[in-house]
Every structure is written in structure tokens, then in C-alpha cells.
């Protein structure tokens, strides 16, 4: 076992009610239209989008989608680790949270955190304010995820909604950390 490896991968997704909105870029990187959604896929010559303290979006506009140029001036939250064990009992309460002592964690820009427990039997989740440092899933809730290989996940996010002549657009910055666990 070599321990935890933290790797940040910056990607972007946009959807305009499955409409073609023309060219869409995030931080200058063009997104590809695929099955109604625009997606930046890391790889090739650009391995990641490097997000800073703001995120710039440009949408050419087409049909019912207006042209949009917007810089969302909040940082994407970063999670470097979770404060959780690698073996988790489904027969008792589980409390875990973001490891705020980890040097890679920079989640101060988050408004909320969505916590998940995923297992072979199902998934459970809770959303809390970013100021809440841990979340507890009860023994009763844990019984729904089953036993075996699973993972814990935290998604810290912030968002704003902008209006373009009646066309509302939500801009969401989200940082996610996933930890593989054994559910016993």
C-alpha cells in the first residue's frame, strides 16, 4: 500500500436544456458537444483546466441560447483528503468529513458540501452548510449501502444564477474527493 495520492483534474460541463448553444469555452478551453451536453475531456495536449480564483465562460449563442460571457469570481473548492477510515462498519453510525488539515484542501470558497456513501447495495447522501465540518450517517441509513467495495465522497460547491434577458444560467464551481473503502 503506497498511501493516498491526490491528483487534481480540472474539467468543465455545460448544458443548455440539451440545446446547441454554439461554441462554448471555459477558461479558454473549448468544450465538445456530446449527447446534449458540452464537456471538456482532459487529455491530449491539455491535461486539465487550471482553475484560479475565478472561472471564465464564453458561449457563442445559438437558437434560444443567447451569447454569454461571464467570469464567476469565486474559486473552485479543492479537497485534498477525507477524514475517514478505510474500513467502514455498516452496523454502526458513520461520521466523516473533509480533512481541513490536508495541505491540498482549500475549500473556503464553498457554500455547501454534499456527502455520499456509495456501496454495492445503494447510495446515500446529505447536504450540509460548508461551515459544518463533519456529517453523520446513522446505522439505519448505512444499512442501505450493503457490504463490500464502496467509496465515500465529498463535493464542496458554490454557485450563482445569472439572468440573460430572461434566460437563467447557473454557474457552479465544485471540487470532489473520492475515497475507496471497504464496507463491512
Question: Model-flagged regions — what are they?
Answer:
Residues 1-50:
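Solvent-exposed N-terminal domain segments of exported/luminal and surface proteins
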Residues 41-48, 133-142:
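Exposed aromatic-hydrophobic patches
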Residues 173-184:
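Short, low-complexity, Pro/Ser/Thr/Gly-rich segments in the mature regions of secreted, periplasmic
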